[in-house]
C-alpha cells in the first residue's frame, strides 16, 4: 500500500510539473504580474489627474496672458493719442497766445454762474425748511386760532352787510340813468311814439266832452221853446 501511495504522489507531481512546463509561467509569476499591472494602472490614474489639474491651472494663466496681450496694444494706442494731444496743445499756445485771454475771461463768468447756481439751491432748501416749520407751527396752533377767528369773522360780515346795501341803493339811480342812456335808438323811438299817441288822446278828450255838452244843451233849449 505504501508503495502505491508513493507512486501516486510522484505521478501527481509529475502532472503538475508538466502543466507548468506547458504554460511556462509559475503561479507566483502570475501574481507578481497582476500586482505590477494594478500598480501601473493606479500610477497612470494619478498621472492623469495631475495632468488635468495642471491643464486647469494653465487655462486661467493662459487667459490672463491673453488679456494682458490684448490690453497692451490698447494702452499703447491710448498713450499715442495722449502724446498726440499734448503735442497739439503745446502747439496751440505757441501759435495762438491771444486765444487764451478770451478763454480765461469766459471761464470766469462760468465760475461765477456755478457759484450762483450752487447758492440758489441752498437758499431754496433753507426757504423750504422754514416754510415747513411755519406750516407745522400753524397746524399745531390751528384749533385755538380757529376758535378765536370765529367771532372775528362774523363781525366783519355783519359790518359789510349794511355797507353793501347802501352801495346798492346809491348805485341804483345811476344804473337806471346809464341803462336809459344805453338803450338803443329803437326803444327811444317807440317811447316817443307812445308819448305822441298819449298827447293826441289827451287832446281829443276835451273836444269830445265839449261836443257832448253842446248836444245836451240843444235838447234843453228845445224844451224851453216848447
Swiss-Prot record:
Entry-annotated residues carrying Phosphothreonine: 172
Subcellular location: Cell membrane; Cell projection, Growth cone; Cell projection, Growth cone membrane; Synapse
UniProt note on tissues of expression: Expressed in hippocampal neurons, with highest levels of expression in the CA4 and CA3 neurons and lower levels in CA1 neurons. Expressed in the dorsal root ganglion.
Domain IQ: 31-60
Subunit field text: Identified in a complex containing FGFR4, NCAM1, CDH2, PLCG1, FRS2, SRC, SHC1, GAP43 and CTTN. Interacts (via IQ domain) with calmodulin. Binds calmodulin with a greater affinity in the absence of Ca(2+) than in its presence.
Biased composition (Basic and acidic residues): 9-32, 51-84, 98-127, 146-158, 201-214
Key word Cytoplasm present: yes
Biased composition (Low complexity): 85-97, 128-139, 159-192
Induction / repression: Up-regulated by kainic acid-induced seizures. Up-regulated after axotomy.
Sorted UniProt keywords: Calmodulin-binding, Cell membrane, Cell projection, Cytoplasm, Developmental protein, Differentiation, Growth regulation, Lipoprotein, Membrane, Neurogenesis, Palmitate, Phosphoprotein, Synapse
Top-rank lineage group of the source organism: Eukaryota
Family: Belongs to the neuromodulin family.
Protein purpose: This protein is associated with nerve growth. It is a major component of the motile 'growth cones' that form the tips of elongating axons. Plays a role in axonal and dendritic filopodia induction.
Species name: Rattus norvegicus
Keyword Cell membrane carried by entry: yes
Protein name according to UniProt: Neuromodulin
Region annotation (Disordered) ranges: 1-226
GO terms of molecular function: calmodulin binding; lysophosphatidic acid binding; phosphatidylinositol phosphate binding; phosphatidylserine binding
Membrane topology field: Peripheral membrane protein
GO cellular component: axon; cell periphery; cytoplasm; dendrite; filopodium membrane; GABA-ergic synapse; growth cone; growth cone membrane
PTM section of the record: Phosphorylated. Phosphorylation of this protein by a protein kinase C is specifically correlated with certain forms of synaptic plasticity. Palmitoylated by ZDHHC3. Palmitoylation is regulated by ARF6 and is essential for plasma membrane association and axonal and dendritic filopodia induction. Deacylated by LYPLA2.
Phosphoserine carried by residues: 41, 86, 96, 142, 144-145, 191-192
